[in-house]
Amino acid sequence: MSAARQAIASARSVVVKIGSSALTSLEGGLDTTRLDRLADAVEARMRAGSDVVVVSSGAIGAGLAPLGLSRRPRDLATKQAAASVGQLALAHAWGTSFARYGRTVGQVLLSADDFSRREHHRNAQRTLDRLRSLGAVAVVNENDTVATEEIRFGDNDRLAALVAHLVGADALILLSDVEGLYDGDPRKGAATFIPEVRSSADLDGVIAGSGGVLGTGGMASKLSAARLAADAGVPVLLAAAEQAATALGSGTVGTAFAARPVRLSARKFWVRHAADSRGALVLDDGAVQAVAQRRRSLLAAGITAVRGRFHGGDVVDLLAADQRLVARGVVEYDSTELSTMLGRSTTELPDTMQRPVIHADDLVKV
């Protein structure tokens, strides 16, 4: 068994993400029989000594039938209406299922704002920690009724990876309608199964497709979530929901993704993955090389353009001349100040403007 699988099987703190397709039927509504089997697997892992946080999709799918809808809506207002109905059904179903074991369920609805704003981040962390300490099962979902772009977040794959970092999880398990990672689409022809991903080199040639009828998360979102979790030092198991008992038990199914050897610091993880970008700086070739290759601080001399309105302390994107995103960082100056500093060497600037635009400690290559 690989080191990643051993880490997943022995993890004391686990986040389990369950996709829409694993919880809802094509006819609409929740499939409570399948949900009960998933709750059984989670309960078994908890009785084995692990803390488990469940990230559950399915709110929109659960709201379709009660509203007389036959298919997943495309417009935002109807999605949010379906989510508002489905959240009640989803929370009730999880509560009923875990009540068989005397477990209490707490519903936690999060949005991207809760990760990008430090105060929200801390509050969510404290809530989840307290629920676990009280022996309750935290069931997390995205707050679809107020989300905009986030409603297309990738069927909660990215949310699950962020939650894994938030609670300091030792493993992330993604359960959906796929058995793991393939180098092509197994539904369309021959494809080779990939049991282990040790580094990005193992992903060469992998084709990432879109999700199923009821979900929004295809393989692309799962790969993105696995990379995000790896940055946080969390190994990931991607497996079929039908194999939940084995996935949460021995971990001998699906595809295992190894965590990066050296995890990003909490601050750099936040800069790279969680914080909202408030603007962008366009860099010349020398500055791109300095920040992306040599990990140097960004100086005003290497900036050719400022985009957006932002303040000192905000996170901004760093772009090459061809608009390619090369890094993100916490900027020291307001956008109005920076506009007067473009292309000027440090010695040409007033004493109050001789700090780096972004210090190397606040820069993260992407």
Swiss-Prot record:
It is found in: Cytoplasm. ATP binds at residues 17, 176-177, 216-222. Substrate binds at residues 57, 144, 156. One of its GO terms (biological process) is L-proline biosynthetic process. Pathway: Amino-acid biosynthesis; L-proline biosynthesis; L-glutamate 5-semialdehyde from L-glutamate: step 1/2. GO terms for cellular component: cytosol. Residues 278-352 form the PUA domain. Signal peptide: none annotated. One of its GO terms (molecular function) is ATP binding. Its EC number is 2.7.2.11. It comes from the Bacteria. It is an enzyme of class 2 (transferase). Keywords: Amino-acid biosynthesis, ATP-binding, Cytoplasm, Kinase, Nucleotide-binding, Proline biosynthesis, Transferase. Transmembrane segments: none annotated. It catalyses: L-glutamate + ATP = L-glutamyl 5-phosphate + ADP. PANTHER family: GLUTAMATE 5-KINASE, ISOPENTENYL PHOSPHATE KINASE. Catalyzes the transfer of a phosphate group to glutamate to form L-glutamate 5-phosphate. HAMAP family: ProB. Belongs to the glutamate 5-kinase family. This is Glutamate 5-kinase. It comes from Nocardia farcinica (strain IFM 10152). The gene is proB.
